[in-house]
């Protein structure tokens, strides 16, 4: 308990820190069991409250400590590395997962106690951060670089990443694997943002009666969705019209997928598109073939590799 509200801190497993993404995914399979287990519901409500607190500390951070404990990543070159942060890699999905968790919790329990004034303030910060990382008004306030011998652990151009053209998509400096993006517009994470913003709009409209903010969320979701359709797809010479993994808005595309969620493969699972969607089906064929540089096939099996494991 903290301030008379449930409070739950869930470590990622091998590190005594909480990732917004990991903690959401770790409890996701248990959500249907809440109806028969009040203690479990209390635990998950506590996690949602803690995620709210984390976002209010820093919406750009991906991993948090259980208090102002500091981190071995304190030497990273970034703007706001306070003691409560374990790591400060900007990943769009870090802000989508808490919305997804809160939405599903609410859908299953009808409990609105998690939707406090702080939760609403955190969501305003989420939308503000997404808009800043559309980079329509310049490169924004976030950069990240690390002194390391692993290039994918740091961003180029003094931490700002490769240039992007502001076309309505949202920059993600890092992927869900915590590896740096090559081109800033990570399409699977932008897909996730579209779904999350629409869920957020429903909550803000139904629970808070914040009509204007709900409309703002929908408008942003529609803008990002339209940009995905226009700039996040391309004609592959073998597979036809497919979704790109990353783009920069200038016409450059990265053709691959990563074994994580969000990924291109997981788009229907996250609710972005139908499994039968023609572009998705073409993309799926590409991903499960040697046209994907991170597809493997051997005598014992086949699958999708993650860059972090190569």
What are these regions (language model features)?
Residues 1-21:
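Low-complexity, Ser/Thr/Pro/Gly-enriched N-terminal "stalk/linker" regions
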Residues 1-4, 43-62, 121-138, 165-167, ...:
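Long, well-ordered core segments of solenoidal/helical folds
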Residues 164-199, 244-253:
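Acidic/Ser/Thr-rich, low-complexity mid-to-C-terminal regulatory regions of eukaryotic proteins
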Residues 25-38, 97-112, 191-210, 265-276:
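Well-ordered alpha-helical scaffold segments within catalytic/enzyme domains
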Residues 58, 62, 131-148, 185, ...:
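Catalytic cores of carbohydrate-active enzymes
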Residues 16-44, 48-152:
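Aromatic-rich carbohydrate-recognition surfaces in CAZymes
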């Amino acid at each position: 308990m903290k301030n008379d509200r449930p409070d739950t801190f869930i470590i990622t497993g091998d590190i005594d820190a909480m990732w917004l993404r990991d903690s959401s995914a770790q409890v996701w399979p248990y959500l249907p069991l809440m109806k028969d287990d009040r203690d479990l519901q209390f635990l998950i409500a506590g996690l949602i409250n803690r995620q709210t607190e984390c976002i209010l500390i820093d919406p750009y951070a991906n991993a948090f400590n259980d208090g102002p404990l500091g981190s071995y990543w304190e030497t990273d070159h970034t703007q706001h590395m306070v003691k409560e942060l374990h790591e400060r890699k900007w990943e769009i999905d870090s802000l989508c997962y808490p919305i997804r968790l809160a939405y599903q919790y609410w859908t299953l329990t009808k409990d609105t106690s998690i939707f406090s004034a702080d939760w609403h303030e955190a969501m305003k910060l989420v939308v503000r951060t997404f808009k800043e990382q559309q980079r329509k008004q310049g490169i924004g306030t976030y950069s990240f670089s690390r002194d390391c011998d692993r290039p994918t652990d740091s961003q180029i151009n003094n931490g700002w990443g490769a240039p992007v053209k502001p076309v309505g998509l949202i920059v993600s400096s890092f992927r869900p694997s915590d590896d740096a993006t090559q081109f800033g517009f990570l399409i699977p994470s932008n897909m996730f943002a579209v779904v999350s913003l629409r869920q957020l709009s429903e909550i803000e409209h139904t629970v808070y009666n914040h009509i204007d903010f709900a409309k703002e969320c929908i408008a942003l979701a529609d803008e990002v969705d339209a940009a995905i359709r226009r700039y996040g797809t391309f004609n592959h010479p073998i597979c036809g019209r497919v979704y790109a993994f990353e783009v920069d808005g200038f016409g450059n595309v990265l053709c691959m997928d990563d074994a994580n969620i969000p990924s291109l493969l997981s788009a229907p699972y996250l609710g972005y598109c139908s499994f039968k969607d023609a572009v998705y089906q073409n993309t799926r064929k590409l991903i499960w073939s040697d046209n994907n540089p991170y597809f493997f096939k051997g005598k014992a099996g086949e699958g999708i590799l993650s860059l972090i494991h190569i």
